[in-house]
């Protein structure tokens, strides 16, 4: 078994679509970034790559890779799952926590867990929290996410 941890943070960009945990949150401002700004999906990618010893999200999808510009977090997770398979791993489970005032994760938690779980073919737990007004997430300047992933060798 292999364990990985990942994180991501992006500034909020008014008027940009808000993609989070593979879902579009209508009426919410999204995050700026090289791709869709889905910090939950990006943190999961980071955790999965870390667990497999395959680097990090910046190395695989960073700004030096123009073919990944404006791509969805779902597409990134699909690519990471492919890379894991090539490296001989499969996902056992994963968890991601979104840190920010908005969007509210709770009302769409089950949907997010289903979408991410389907992408990884494994259970994914999704949660949300705030920082009680502290830091860039508390001031509404950005959104962060942390994730863990458990992998096993494919048999």
From Swiss-Prot:
Binds 1 divalent metal cation per subunit. Pfam families: YgbB. Belongs to the IspF family. Homotrimer. It comes from the Bacteria. The keyword Lyase applies. The record marks 34, 130 as: Transition state stabilizer. 4-CDP-2-C-methyl-D-erythritol 2-phosphate binds at residues 8-10, 34-35, 56-58, 129-132, 139. Pathway: Isoprenoid biosynthesis; isopentenyl diphosphate biosynthesis via DXP pathway; isopentenyl diphosphate from 1-deoxy-D-xylulose 5-phosphate: step 4/6. Its cofactor is a divalent metal cation. One of its GO terms (biological process) is terpenoid biosynthetic process. Its EC number is 4.6.1.12. This is 2-C-methyl-D-erythritol 2,4-cyclodiphosphate synthase. InterPro entries: MECDP_synthase (IPR003526), MECDP_synthase_CS (IPR020555), MECDP_synthase_sf (IPR036571). Keywords: Isoprene biosynthesis, Lyase, Metal-binding. GO terms for molecular function: 2-C-methyl-D-erythritol 2,4-cyclodiphosphate synthase activity; metal ion binding. Involved in the biosynthesis of isopentenyl diphosphate (IPP) and dimethylallyl diphosphate (DMAPP), two major building blocks of isoprenoid compounds. Catalyzes the conversion of 4-diphosphocytidyl-2-C-methyl-D-erythritol 2-phosphate (CDP-ME2P) to 2-C-methyl-D-erythritol 2,4-cyclodiphosphate (ME-CPP) with a corresponding release of cytidine 5-monophosphate (CMP). The keyword Methyltransferase does not apply. SUPFAM superfamilies: IpsF-like (SSF69765). A divalent metal cation binds at residues 8, 10, 42. It catalyses: 4-CDP-2-C-methyl-D-erythritol 2-phosphate = 2-C-methyl-D-erythritol 2,4-cyclic diphosphate + CMP.
């Amino acid at each position: 078994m292999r364990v990985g941890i990942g994180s991501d943070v992006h500034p909020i960009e008014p008027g940009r679509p808000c993609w989070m945990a593979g879902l579009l949150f209508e009426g919410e401002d999204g995050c700026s970034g090289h791709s869709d700004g889905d910090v939950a999906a990006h943190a999961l990618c980071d955790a999965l790559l870390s667990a497999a010893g395959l680097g990090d999200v910046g190395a695989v999808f960073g700004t030096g890779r123009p073919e990944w510009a404006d791509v969805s977090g779902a597409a990134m997770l699909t690519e990471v799952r492919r890379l894991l398979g090539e490296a001989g791993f499969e996902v056992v489970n994963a968890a991601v926590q979104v840190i920010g005032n908005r969007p509210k994760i709770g009302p769409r938690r089950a949907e997010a867990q289903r979408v991410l779980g389907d992408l990884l073919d494994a259970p994914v737990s999704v949660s949300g929290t705030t920082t009680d007004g502290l830091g860039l997430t508390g001031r509404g300047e950005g959104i962060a996410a942390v994730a863990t992933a458990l992998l096993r060798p494919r048999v």
